[in-house]
Amino acid sequence: MDATNDATLSQDERTAALREAIRGEAFPEWVPESNNHIHTCYSFSPYTPTHAALLARRAGLRVVGSVDHDSIAAAPEMTAATRALGMGSVTGFEIRARFDPDGPLDGRKLNNPDSAGIAYMTVQGVPAPARAAVDAWLAPKRQARLRRTLAMADEANTVLAGLGLEPFDPCSDMVAASQYAHGGGITERHLLAAMASALIRGFGRGPALVAGLGTMGVTVPAALAGALADPGNPHLVFDLLGVLKAEYLDRVYIQPTDELATADEVVAFADSVGAIATYAYLGDVSASPTGDKKAEKFEDDFLDELFDAMEAKGLRAVTYMPPRNTPAQLERVHRLAAAHGMLEISGVDINQPRQAFNCPELRRPEFAGLNEATWALVAHEALSSVDPALHLLGRTGRLGPDRLAQRIAQYAPLGRRIADGEAADRVAEDATRA
């Protein structure tokens, strides 16, 4: 195994392996792209933070960001790896929250296919000195999520037993396969990967697997039927996991309760540590690039109302994935973000090996602002690690659209200087407060 992607090694060992590996490697020219939404082995991903950074560099990206579920553990490694590669980094975490428990949006399907009223949020640009506080805040949420996931594993094993198949061992096949012992999170994908492996062992590979899924009532999308029936498919577990997430998870799913913060609490915590809380826009889905989401309606019917609620809760940023949305959806989100004075952050979910790190949409002129905002975030994280007062958006309050544009224009060049290797404390001398 490539040492940069060996999850059994320490973070220092992986970054040391990276520095050795890149000595003789010829990398491509930089492209005007970034990705601020990469999952690593500290939630669910085939990649360590070091290897994710390396793959991003091989794709020509200049900035990469990690947002693991309920975990900040990837941050120091991602930062060190990107520095070795001459890249910028933006680190944080992803979390689910009760968005509007006492308001009119409670019970609405937001950006979460599994739960009404519960939203995916990210907290990005976490200053390095705040990582310990972030980990302490997330730890009980990880523990509660593990308990719930173990209960769902019991439900999944009941299904397997009913099919006459050997169940999986939640401890060895799910928990031990994660980085939970090292501050990583446990997600439904860990559960479904264990279940997928058990189904493959039980039904066998090839057409027998597809036939077995049919006996479970699983609808296999036409686009994935060939891959699931291919006995030589090297990504079979990931492909089957995606189908199970879209088509079967609801049969074993237990709704989260005590592990959830409210959106207001997430915003307050992010502000307290100098990070930036965001709402992750999904939008109505017609077809999922990864096969893990069914065609379904999400926020678009009430998006104006949602942005009003986001502003009322103190959210100062929105993140979205340009490849997953239509031009009309993207234009509308951009217009609303500008009207509400919200920073726009781009990123493409990376959690399985078929996904490309590139986001060619960001090369289009209309998305130039997203690249500049990313560079401003690079500066924000590094500079606020030196001086908390150098927060891109200011520690509290909301910037007007013109002032926000000015801050991005000032901070983006500083982010590039940091990626070029200049010390953050030196760059901080040229930064101003919001």
Spell out what each predicted region is.
Residues 1-118, 242-269, 273-274, 279-355, ...:
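An N-terminally biased module of ancient metal coordination in phosphate/nucleic-acid-related enzymes
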Residues 48-52, 80, 163-192, 205, ...:
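General structural signal for secondary-structure boundaries
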Residues 93, 125-127, 160:
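Generic hydrophobic/packing signal
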Residues 101-144, 196-251, 363-386, 391-392:
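Active-site gating loops and adjacent loop-to-helix segments of metal-dependent hydrolytic enzymes
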Residues 129-222, 415-433:
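Non-catalytic, alpha-helical, charged scaffold/linker segments
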Residues 355-363:
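Outer-membrane beta-barrel translocator/channel fold
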Residues 383-434:
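Intrinsic low-complexity, glycine/proline- and repeat-rich
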